[in-house]
Amino acid sequence: MNRVAVIHGPNLNLLGRREPEVYGTKSLENINKEIEKRANNLKIEVDIFQSNHEGEIIDFIHDNYKALSGIIINPGGLTHYSIALRDALAAVRLPVVEVHISNIHKREDFRHRSVIASVAVGQITGLGTEGYLYALEAIVNIIKKGSY
């Protein structure tokens, strides 16, 4: 069975409370339950991880990539400047789908650039928390095709 990591970056632990007009009212716990349910329907295993610390996210990738078939990541604020996270994702040579709940291209100028996008097979942005579920379906198809 394929195993996919779903990584939530900084401040995503505050979903449901943080700027609900931008990110909605679902808590991270509820989002994770939806992810687990969809993964079960798709017959894949998911490892869900959240950290507010760049190094912990990189360590998680390093420590787990050999058991993974792909990575779904919402890097949060790390999207715009974390070359170290970008390099960690590139180094493990797995398909990566980048997810953003809000449309980063409709927000402040500094949010328009993603350093992660260049190592991702695709990016889902602005479709709310459903973006995680679309990413699961996409990564399953990418893994089946074996090309990324």
Curated annotation (Swiss-Prot):
In this chain, substrate is annotated as bound at 74, 80, 87, 101-102, 111
Superkingdom: Bacteria
Annotated site (Transition state stabilizer), which positions? 18
Q: Which UniProt keywords apply?
A: Amino-acid biosynthesis, Aromatic amino acid biosynthesis, Lyase
Q: Where are the transmembrane segments?
A: none
Pathway listed: Metabolic intermediate biosynthesis; chorismate biosynthesis; chorismate from D-erythrose 4-phosphate and phosphoenolpyruvate: step 3/7
Q: Please, one GO biological process term?
A: amino acid biosynthetic process
Question: What EC number(s) does its UniProt record assign?
Answer: 4.2.1.10
Q: Which InterPro entries match?
A: DHquinase_II, DHquinase_II_CS, DHquinase_II_sf
| Pfam families assigned to the protein according to its UniProt record, in alphabetical order | DHquinase_II
Positions of the catalytic residues: 23 (proton acceptor), 100 (proton donor)
Q: Which GO terms describe its molecular function?
A: 3-dehydroquinate dehydratase activity
Which reactions appear under catalytic activity for this entry? 3-dehydroquinate = 3-dehydroshikimate + H2O
Xref: HAMAP family:
AroQ (MF_00169)
Per the similarity annotation, which family is this?
Answer: Belongs to the type-II 3-dehydroquinase family.
What is its quaternary makeup? Homododecamer.
Q: What does this protein do?
A: Catalyzes a trans-dehydration via an enolate intermediate.
What is the name attached to this protein's record?
3-dehydroquinate dehydratase
Species this protein is from: Halothermothrix orenii (strain H 168 / OCM 544 / DSM 9562)
- Name of the gene encoding the protein in the UniProt record: aroQ
